[in-house]
Amino acid sequence: MRIPLDQAAESWRARAARFATEELIPWEVEAELNEGRLPPEVKARHKRLAIEHGFSAMDVPVEYGGRNARVVEQVAVWEQLGRVTNALCWCFSEPHRWMFEACTDEQLQRFVLPLMSGKRKECYAITESGSGSDVAIETTARRAPDGYRISGEKWYVTSANHADFFILQARLADGPHAGSHALFFIDGDQPGIELVRTPVFSHTFSDHHPIYRFNDVLVPESQRLGTEGDGMQYSHSWFRRERLMIAARCCGAASRLIEEATAFASTRMVGGEPLSERQMIQAMLADSVTELWAARLITYEAARAHDDGEDLRSLHARCSVAKLYASEAANRIADRVVQILGGRGYMRENAAERFFRELRVDRIWEGTSEIQRLIIARALLKRGLEGM
């Protein structure tokens, strides 16, 4: 069941498939049994190969040394990387196109381009204890003679334990744009940054999601992205892309789950015949394939719309449709596959058990399923079905 891809996109897909299958998947169980950790030399190899394959440069313009990959090519890559558990595919950072619109040359050289080469690692500090999908930011950026003073607490700062700088969203406390948002680069060693605690989550990742408190942290004006008030616009750009790539990863996870369930059901003997001969098992497999096929079509169609330069408001809704459907379908598929595998599906050494835990958060982060439904409904009511 393949989406027709042109030669360039197929080349990206095949490269990612080999990387996932040959380099990452063989290390999943060791990572699972060691709190997500792998030997340093293995992690270094994964990072080096990912960069050599161009994955860290996909969304970077050619003039900055990037690959300028189309969105459909990026979706093809992340679908294959989504077949891997334990977030082992998070072995590289990738700058996003909106950064090259927002950042000064100095910021690009200091913060953004080193992500592509692997010399630096970022983390996003957006969510707060009293805000999530609605991005009701309480962290403030108050004007100071030498820049801004940042104060507030950020939750779920993904990969902060591996990062050396934050991309933080704050509400402007004063000035002509008071009440609007801005984004800031903040080096991790800035005075006033406090690690509050590191919660333990259901998945087994080496990348943690800690809580940080920013205590009157001084940030120079030169580290603000874009102009005052642009923060939400750039966050929307990030959310659109991330939601689409989550959909792609969910499609990859669902594909692997179905393959494993099919292989198991075909060889597991029950009452003298393969489990796959049972019609209830066949129904579960059929439902899973149907949902996967629908999720892939939705996701690749949204990628095509991106590449064709369609209206941003329409794209925002389409990415929400893709994330909503693909993430919820992948969760249903994981549940069925655990059921098909029986007790084996509840063993951490099997991918089905790991996906069962890991996929759950895809219905929460980067906008909950409920928020995606609101975005979709509002787009429908404003622009009609043909305008979406």
Describe each PLM feature range.
Residues 1-89, 105-107, 114-118, 143-148, ...:
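Alpha-helical interface subdomain recognition
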Residues 69-71, 133-136, 159-163, 177-180, ...:
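Short glycine/proline-enriched turns and hinge-like loops at secondary-structure junctions
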Residues 88-106, 135:
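N-terminal glycine-rich flavin-associated loop
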Residues 118-126, 169:
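A short, Trp-centered hydrophobic/proline-enriched beta-strand micro-motif
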Residues 132-133, 148:
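Hydrophobic, small-residue-rich alpha-helical packing segments that form membrane-like cores
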Residues 136-138, 189-220:
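Flexible, small-/acidic-enriched active-site or ligand-binding loops
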Residues 151-196:
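A short core secondary-structure module
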Residues 212-237:
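A short, charged helix-loop
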